[in-house]
Amino acid sequence: KKDQPMFMPLPSDQTHYGYFNDFMTYNSGDWTITTAEDGTGSATEAMTSGAGGQFLITNAAGDNDHDFFNLKGESFLITGSKRAYFSARFKVSDATQSDFVMGLQITDTSPLAVSDGIFFIKDDGDTNLDFIVEKDSTSTDTTAIHTMADDTFVTVAFFVDPDTALVHYSVNNAEPVGVVNTNLPDNEELTISFGIQNGAA
């Protein structure tokens, strides 16, 4: 496993570019934020105490109330000709009654139904984490790659490998699994995209 590209040390910033955030601090102005607040209360976003840095998203109380984030500026063009790597660590309080997404997407107010991106997603009503590679609303779906649990951290990663025409994904540092890059979104700049939607009131 140590020879897999996605487990290599971080590359030099002189030959690569990227975005890194441990959420020791948070500036809402860096993000395009989309919320729905039909239930009681309001969506909130705040730093919270926790080793390594933690960012807490709290939705309003209604079914389908949500809070989604797109990093401003679409800075990542994934053509498949160069290596690209993404990783994130997160948890959800209710692993069943929720929809969430984490990955790279175009800026969209509906990231659960986006047209272009490479991302991890979970649907309401189950605990199955899925991995999606999507271009122009046509996707390669790899379903049920992991079972989410309430209030339990998960680490997800993907690596675009130009040498094999594959996109590799990994959960909790397990052996990477490769999927075809047929639907790699190579004609759109992408950005960091994540968020959560309530599955019940």
Describe the function of each predicted region.
Residues 171-175:
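Short strand-turn-strand beta-turns centered on an Asx-Gly dipeptide
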Residues 133-155:
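Short, aromatic/His-centered strand-loop micro-motif at the edge of beta-sheets
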Residues 179-201:
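Flexible glycan-contacting loops in extracellular carbohydrate-active proteins
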Residues 29-56:
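Extracellular glycan-recognition surfaces and repeat-rich motifs
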Residues 58-130:
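Secretory/extracellular carbohydrate-interaction modules
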Residues 71-78, 141-148, 180-182:
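Beta-strand-rich interaction surfaces with strong enrichment in secreted/lumenal proteins
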Residues 1-37:
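Extracellular carbohydrate-recognition regions
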Residues 152-167:
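Localized edge beta-strand/strand-to-loop motifs within extracellular or lumenal beta-rich domains
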